């Protein structure tokens, strides 16, 4: 006495579809655990992330000429007059 279970082709396709989604979800979760969910390879060592306190401050220094030099000829297109001396400016960031 043999017993055969007949499965409708639509039901079989649905079972295969659900099983494939479950397998893809398991592969994703396993890879997320292995790769620390940040895309970093666990077999490589990474430098620790720098904090804001450990970074050095950046100092910007802007130099302006106080007197126009002879290498800048004044032509008819340059009618700026006599610019006031600007000096040295610095900005601490």
From Swiss-Prot:
GO CC list: membrane
Region (Disordered): 73-93
Taxonomy of the source species: Eukaryota, Metazoa, Chordata, Craniata, Vertebrata
Gene name of the encoded protein: SMIM36
Transmembrane parts of this sequence: 14-34
Key words, A-Z: Membrane, Transmembrane, Transmembrane helix
Protein name according to UniProt: Small integral membrane protein 36
Subcellular location: Membrane
Membrane topology: Single-pass membrane protein
Top-rank taxon: Eukaryota
Species of provenance: Homo sapiens
Major localization class: membrane
